[in-house]
Amino acid sequence: MPLKTIDGIEYEVLTPAQVVVKKALINPLMNYVLPKSLVLYGINKSRSPLLKESILRPGGWRSMEISYENGPHVDWVDMLALKFSTFPMSLRNRRKLVARVICGLINHYAAAGHVNILGIGAGTGTNVMSGMAQSGKKNVSAHLIDLDSDAFEYGQGLCRKYGLHEDAVSFIEGDAVDIKSHIKVTPQIVKLVGIIEYLSDDEVRKLLAVSRDALPRGGSILSHSISRAHGVDRFTRRIFNLNLTYRSDTRVMELMGEAGFGDFRVRHEPLGVYSVIVGVKK
């Protein structure tokens, strides 16, 4: 796929011809024409790690990491899913953008002393650790909380891969609603990435309230919107049972505003699926 550099970030993009072919042919075929039984048969015959993991645990951390890593494809079906599907492409774009934004926030707060980052629903923590590595700052700690500790061992390996000291990253199994019982520091940055698209508005409000209470005045929250611009929402629902809650950047900012955040900054990845949003506690 072609690449496009925007503000120093190398993104995956589609050519105008590819956009037309996807909209006119590929997406309708996947969404409405191909029988579910035939698709599942093809996935079963394929050796694609991404597709098999998406069947077992749709939206789980393993399928995310497979998409992020973007390793060599194992067969032509895997190539189509991993290399040419807009969804994994946009996920990789989002990770790059989130890491860059986190890096910028670290640099902003590091001038005043030690920086603490709270990752909610953090999974492996790759977004946070990538941002930490990019910043090059040593006075940064990440506190990564998730209900499921399944991803933590993999995340510890990523910590070593990014060249971060193991004491700089803490993996915490628990519910973010009880965050004060899990961490004793005050974070300057809270990250809500890869979680709110699986939650209702009321559930998001609860996490935003927890985030607001954890942050000092002037602290930042980072989250994102998601749109159907990937073009295969119906396909992912009927094949993988992946039911996402789509919110525009405007809607996410409305929810953040209700929780007491403002001074919003929004950056978009070029495929139009994700926008990264930063708000500041008033």
Model feature map: region roles:
Residues 2-37, 58, 62-65, 70-77, ...:
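Class I (Rossmann-like) S-adenosyl-L-methionine-dependent methyltransferase catalytic domain
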Residues 22, 41-49:
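Intracellular loop-helix junctions on the cytosolic face of multi-pass helical membrane proteins
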Residues 53-54:
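Short, surface-exposed "cap/lid" segments of acyl-processing enzymes
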Residues 119-121:
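Conserved S-adenosyl-L-methionine
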Residues 187-188:
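Conserved acidic residues
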Residues 191-194:
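A conserved beta-strand element that flanks and buttresses the S-adenosyl-L-methionine
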Residues 199-200, 215-217:
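Helix-to-beta-strand junctions that scaffold the AdoMet/dcAdoMet cofactor pocket
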